[in-house]
């Protein structure tokens, strides 16, 4: 697999042109465009495993033809993943316990040098498998890997030591530490994530009052933004993400951030007094003066009720993984707010995917940060 690196500037320019056109009806200012590294930028990857007369190798499927193809090196993935791909298969080849009915391998790496390898099977994992996996892990450590090894099968998950890696990001000269659990969402392009965090901090610099974040995940944004605000209230529905967020809050010494496990839609109902939630016991929403809201919704964008709630805030920071639903949401948001800043973050080079951000301020807040 080779990358069209020489085409990257033109591909990025085309994305910027497309996003600029989508934002044009809303009087958006000039885009801040953040380019990615042109190779080895992706920190996670997953592959099917193909067994062929005693040999085995990683495969992927062509999106157009659906035909499988062999993958020995994967230049969009981190150097760490590429090195592990080669060493891992060499170490398990010929080991019946570790290779039999192995159908997929997932890799999660970090900028900090740690990597988690998840091996997925169409069989139950036995004590014998665990013993062989422990020996495999020791051999991988012998190669210099800081590795966690996880086995998964139907209704089974075995982490030899733990099921997470620890990331460290240098954001505006400060190190933020994040626990990232395998098979949970993490930002795939680590260096671009840093650029997104720094852009979000630049937008919210000198903010007054409190911040509300919907869809906070493992606290990626809310932790980095916490010292910009008096207090931060954040929501997330995934149990594993909430647990990671709580750990990340503690390890970063953040004392003004509260995470609530509920969906954005449920929180909207709570704010509007539609329902009373047991999960909100002990949390007095009236103690928060949230004049800024941060949203990073799924591809479908914000639902109508949440969109209306978001309009009630003076300042809106909206990170989008789908510029078309962003544009659709902006039709309503720009009735009350104006776009002060907008950005393109090239999380996924060589694809049509566009990650973007907009910073909106209520129309009567002229000249205010």
Curated annotation (Swiss-Prot):
EC top class named in words: transferase
GO biological process assignments: tRNA methylation
Signal peptide: none
EC number annotated for this UniProt entry: 2.1.1.-, 2.1.1.35
Catalysed reaction, written as an equation: uridine(54) in tRNA + S-adenosyl-L-methionine = 5-methyluridine(54) in tRNA + S-adenosyl-L-homocysteine + H(+); uridine(341) in tmRNA + S-adenosyl-L-methionine = 5-methyluridine(341) in tmRNA + S-adenosyl-L-homocysteine + H(+)
One Pfam family recorded for the sequence: tRNA_U5-meth_tr
A GO CC term attached to the entry: cytosol
MF terms in GO: rRNA binding; tRNA (uracil(54)-C5)-methyltransferase activity, S-adenosyl methionine-dependent; tRNA binding
Keywords: Methyltransferase, S-adenosyl-L-methionine, Transferase, tRNA processing
Active site positions, chain numbering: 321 (nucleophile), 355 (proton acceptor)
Superkingdom to which the source organism belongs: Bacteria
PROSITE patterns: SAM_MT_RNA_M5U, TRMA_1, TRMA_2
List of residues binding S-adenosyl-L-methionine: 187, 215, 220, 236, 296
PANTHER family found in the cross-reference section: TRNA/TMRNA (URACIL-C(5))-METHYLTRANSFERASE (PTHR47790), TRNA_TMRNA (URACIL-C(5))-METHYLTRANSFERASE (PTHR47790:SF2)
Protein task: Dual-specificity methyltransferase that catalyzes the formation of 5-methyluridine at position 54 (m5U54) in all tRNAs, and that of position 341 (m5U341) in tmRNA (transfer-mRNA).
Similarity annotation: Belongs to the class I-like SAM-binding methyltransferase superfamily. RNA M5U methyltransferase family. TrmA subfamily.
Classification via HAMAP family: RNA_methyltr_TrmA
Name of this protein: tRNA/tmRNA (uracil-C(5))-methyltransferase
């Amino acid at each position: 697999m080779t990358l069209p690196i020489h085409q990257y500037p033109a591909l990025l320019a085309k994305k910027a042109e497309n996003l600029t056109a989508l934002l044009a009806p809303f009087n958006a200012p000039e885009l801040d465009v953040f380019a990615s590294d042109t190779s080895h930028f992706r920190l996670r990857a997953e592959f099917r495993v193909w067994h062929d007369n005693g040999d085995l190798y990683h495969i992927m499927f062509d999106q157009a033809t659906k035909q499988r193809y062999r993958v020995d090196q994967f230049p969009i993935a981190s150097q760490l993943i590429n090195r592990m791909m080669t060493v891992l298969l060499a170490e398990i080849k010929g080991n019946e316990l570790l290779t039999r009915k192995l159908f997929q391998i997932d890799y999660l790496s970090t900028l900090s040098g740690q990597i988690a390898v998840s091996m997925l099977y169409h069989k139950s994992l036995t004590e014998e498998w665990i013993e062989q996996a422990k020996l495999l892990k020791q051999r991988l450590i012998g190669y210099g890997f800081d590795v966690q090894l996880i086995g998964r099968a139907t209704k089974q998950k075995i982490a030899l030591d733990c099921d997470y890696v620890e990331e460290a990001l240098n954001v505006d000269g400060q190190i933020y530490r994040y626990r990232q659990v395998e098979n949970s969402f993490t930002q795939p392009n680590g260096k671009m994530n840093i650029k997104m965090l720094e852009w979000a901090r630049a937008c919210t610099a000198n903010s007054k009052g409190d911040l509300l974040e919907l869809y906070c995940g493992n606290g990626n944004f809310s932790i980095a933004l916490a010292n910009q605000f008096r207090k931060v209230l954040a929501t997330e529905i995934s149990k594993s993400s909430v647990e990671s967020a709580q750990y990340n809050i503690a390890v970063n010494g953040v004392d003004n951030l509260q995470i609530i496990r509920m969906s954005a839609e449920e929180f909207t109902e709570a704010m509007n007094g539609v329902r009373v939630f047991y999960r909100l016991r002990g949390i007095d929403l009236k103690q928060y003066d949230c004049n800024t809201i941060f949203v990073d919704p799924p591809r479908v964008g914000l639902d109508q009720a949440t969109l209306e709630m978001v309009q009630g805030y003076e300042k809106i920071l909206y990170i989008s993984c789908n510029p078309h639903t962003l544009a659709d949401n902006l039709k309503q948001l720009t009735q009350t707010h104006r776009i002060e800043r907008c950005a393109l973050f090239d999380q996924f080079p060589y694809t049509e995917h566009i990650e973007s951000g907009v910073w909106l301020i209520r129309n009567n807040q002229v000249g205010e940060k």
